[in-house]
């Protein structure tokens, strides 16, 4: 592609202007005749504009967010519960062969490529056993047979790293004084772990949960593209491949907003799980 062709494409799409401040203009045009003012300022009012094919991006987001949520929410909730439970079991049997076996299993699961889970799961469940469709999506209850395999793969692929991280958090807590005090009062080990240790480990758990908040809305880029699910993840991938900057810009902005909202919600949730934390400082 020649530089001339690049310049023509930029001019056609309005990207030949200055980014934030146009020195070539006079007065307020220095500020308004910029890419930021023309393309990005409207995003703060959640006006996403139109894609290159003329489709309304806001309507596409409203339509595509539900398939993304159908995958991301179960993966997040079930995956977190599975990781915490598995980590608690390893901590319960800590310094034993069961704990060592669990750690080895976590390392093995972490070492396997994500693409292997996708290809292997699709090949076994979809092609060999023919339990679920290989790809596609449907509305209503029919969507269950299309999302169950991506959800399962999303959960299994994250168990290794998630459980190992939670195990580290819980092991750090079990050596503290309040745990020894709880045991001295005659509480069972199960109650100590799932009531006292888990409660005091909630702050780092909540902090880690913030990172995945944008994916709850925007979906998984690889999962949706691989299984042909019309969610926001595949929407973003298609936009990148088509060089549709309007869609890419909108999705990046949306992800940033969700991340900031997640940080605020996390700070609020700290006050719920730990009475020592106060928002007023």
Please name every model-derived segment.
Residues 38-42, 122-123, 154, 224:
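Generic alpha-helical structural context detector
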Residues 23-80, 84:
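An internal, D/E-rich "acidic patch" concept
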Residues 43-47, 51, 128-132, 173:
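A short secondary-structure junction motif
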Residues 1-33, 129-146:
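Hydrophobic alpha-helical transmembrane segments of membrane transport/permease proteins
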Residues 31, 35, 39, 56, ...:
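Amphipathic alpha-helical recognition patches that constitute DNA-binding helices
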Residues 1, 104-133, 153-157, 164:
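Membrane-water interface segments at the C-terminal ends of transmembrane alpha-helices
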Residues 65-98, 114, 139-281:
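Alpha-helical transmembrane segments of integral membrane proteins
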Residues 17, 26-39, 56, 96, ...:
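Coil-to-alpha-helix initiation sites in intrinsically disordered, low-complexity, charged segments
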């Amino acid at each position: 592609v020649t530089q001339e062709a690049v310049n023509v494409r930029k001019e056609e799409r309005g990207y030949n202007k200055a980014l934030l401040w146009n020195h070539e203009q006079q007065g307020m045009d220095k500020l308004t005749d910029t890419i930021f003012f023309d393309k990005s300022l409207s995003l703060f009012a959640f006006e996403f504009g139109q894609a290159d094919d003329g489709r309304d991006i806001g309507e596409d987001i409203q339509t595509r967010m539900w398939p993304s949520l159908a995958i991301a929410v179960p993966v997040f909730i079930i995956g977190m519960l599975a990781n915490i439970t598995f980590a608690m079991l390893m901590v319960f049997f800590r310094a034993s062969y069961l704990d060592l076996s669990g750690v080895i299993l976590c390392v093995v699961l972490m070492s396997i490529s994500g693409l292997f889970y996708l290809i292997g799961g699709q090949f076994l469940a979809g092609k060999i056993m023919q339990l679920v469709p290989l790809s596609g999506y449907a509305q209503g209850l029919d969507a269950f047979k299309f999302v169950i395999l991506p959800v399962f793969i999303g959960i299994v692929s994250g168990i290794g790293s998630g459980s190992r991280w939670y195990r580290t958090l819980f092991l750090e807590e079990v050596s503290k004084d309040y745990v020894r005090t709880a045991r001295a009062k005659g509480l069972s080990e199960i109650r100590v772990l799932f009531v006292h240790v888990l409660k005091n480990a909630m702050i780092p758990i909540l902090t880690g949960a913030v990172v995945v908040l944008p994916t709850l809305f925007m979906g998984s880029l690889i999962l949706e593209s691989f299984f042909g699910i019309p969610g926001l993840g595949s929407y973003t991938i298609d936009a990148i491949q088509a060089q549709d900057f309007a869609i890419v810009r909108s999705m990046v902005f949306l992800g940033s907003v969700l991340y900031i909202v997640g940080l605020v919600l996390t700070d609020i949730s700290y006050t719920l799980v730990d009475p020592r934390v106060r928002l007023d400082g």
